[in-house]
Curated annotation (Swiss-Prot):
Positions contributing to substrate binding: D115, D175, G233, T235, R247, W251, S365, S368
Effect upon mutating K370I: Prefers unsulfated glycosaminoglycans compared to sulfated glycosaminoglycans
Family, similarity comment: Belongs to the glycosyl hydrolase 88 family.
UniProt name for this protein: Unsaturated chondroitin disaccharide hydrolase
Domain of life of the source: Bacteria
Record-listed E.C. numbers: 3.2.1.180
Taxonomic lineage of the native organism: Bacteria, Bacillati, Bacillota, Bacilli, Lactobacillales
Any one Gene Ontology BP term: polysaccharide catabolic process
Length: 398
């Protein structure tokens, strides 16, 4: 077992701001799901067998084909909704999507990047787990093989964007703590140790480099392509190289417990607590994060609801594994309820118009001006996943 570097675990500041809140009831969660599904059904008619753009434009998604890194989240929303109500209309459309994903991997359409997990886990892995569909399994394993092509032995990580091996692209990103779950699944299905080894190596490379000593996270981290030595952490989506991009922090909060399920390394619990406490201590009054954790109330900056929704899923997952004696366990429980309640009551969509998101006020890419204070499809997915998690004993797609 490899070592994870020691990180600072902050004490949760003023835990009563969470502990004094009321837990969501099952009826409240069910009402939130029903409300979300009303918009989902409108969007099904709007998208047809196509997909939403990654983010909305003036709070309306445009329609696109299956060529973005985000398309799997739409199909994931369909599967989550199907698991809630067993509507065969949802199943049929989601399955047609899965066939589109099989075609995409067979023809290698717009797949030269690291986001194979985001594409294939909530779409194809989901269908295999729900229906045992062999085409869904075929697509998933082929996608895992494609992701394996980006593995760099020198440094032991999956390279993010760009041409493989080039110095200016020789880096990992924290997002891939979710993408490597595709490799764990491939190992689970095939028994081939190569998938698990790459996933494990990438996890440790991330834990020891992209996470700072204070448990905040860089977005990306560079390595030397000749030696594999760690070089530097920088941002691409965050405010600065020194700040902590909220969604990146949330990828860590969710990616760690997902990996802990498969690795069972106790060091991961400490890392989770460090990253989660850092996130919770920088939430504003309404408990929904700004797009970078450097900002809080009065900054005039937009929220990123997708980061908060993702963090809720991560906390919910890790509560399964935290020992009962953990002093923060009760606070985590109340914190995730408080965050999800705020999303439901203050940030969920109320206008039933074709193309509207389920969740408002997200940020796609602040520096490039894309999807700023807009809905985004991963925010919709993780919001709906969080609701389903709170509603039933749900078998993960990840």
């Amino acid at each position: 077992m490899m070592k994870i570097k020691p990180v600072k675990v902050e004490s949760i500041e003023n835990p009563k701001r969470f502990l004094n809140s009321r837990l969501l009831t099952k009826i409240e969660v069910e009402e939130a799901i029903e409300k979300a599904l009303k918009q989902l059904y409108i969007n099904i008619d709007y998208f047809g067998e196509e997909y939403p753009t990654p983010a909305t434009f003036n709070n309306i998604y445009k329609v696109m084909d299956n060529t973005e890194w985000t398309n799997g989240f739409w199909t994931g929303c369909l599967w989550l909704a199907y698991e809630y109500n067993q509507d065969k209309k949802l199943k049929n459309i989601a399955h047609k999507n899965v066939l589109s994903f099989l075609n995409r991997i067979n023809n290698r359409i717009a797949l030269d990047h690291h986001d194979l997990g985001f594409l294939y886990t909530p779409s194809c892995t989901a269908e295999y787990r729900i229906n045992g569909d062999v085409k869904a399994l075929e697509a998933t394993i082929k996608a895992a093989d494609k992701l394996m092509e980006r593995y760099q032995e020198k440094g032991g990580f999956i390279q993010a964007w760009g041409e493989l091996g080039y110095k200016e692209h020789y880096r990992l990103i924290i997002d891939c703590l979710l993408n490597i779950q595709l490799l764990f699944f491939a190992y689970e299905q095939t028994g081939d140790e190569k998938y698990r080894q790459v996933a494990v190596n990438h996890f440790y490379a991330s834990a020891n480099n992209v996470v700072r000593d204070d448990s905040s996270a860089f977005h990306t981290f560079y390595f030397d392509p000749e030696t594999g030595e760690p070089l530097k952490g920088v941002t691409r989506q965050g405010y600065s190289d020194e700040s902590s991009w909220a969604r990146g922090q949330a990828w860590g909060i969710y990616g760690i417990p997902l990996s802990y399920r498969k690795m069972k390394d106790y060091q991961q619990i400490i890392l989770f607590k460090g990253m989660t406490n850092y996130f919770l201590n920088r939430l504003p009054e309404d408990k929904v994060s700004y797009w970078d954790l450097i900002f809080t109330d009065g900054s005039g900056q937009p929220r990123d609801t997708s980061a908060t929704a993702t963090a809720v899923c991560g906390i919910h997952e890790m509560l399964k594994y935290l020992p009962e004696v953990d002093p923060d366990k009760e606070t985590y429980k109340y914190a995730m309820h408080t965050m999800l309640r705020s999303l439901i009551e203050q940030y969920s969509n109320n206008e039933l118009i074709a193309g509207r998101p389920l969740l408002l006020h997200g940020v796609y890419s602040w520096h490039s001006g894309k999807g700023v204070d807009e809905g985004n499809i991963w925010g919709d997915y993780y919001y709906l996943e969080a609701l389903i998690r709170f509603y039933k004993d749900w078998e993960l797609y990840w």
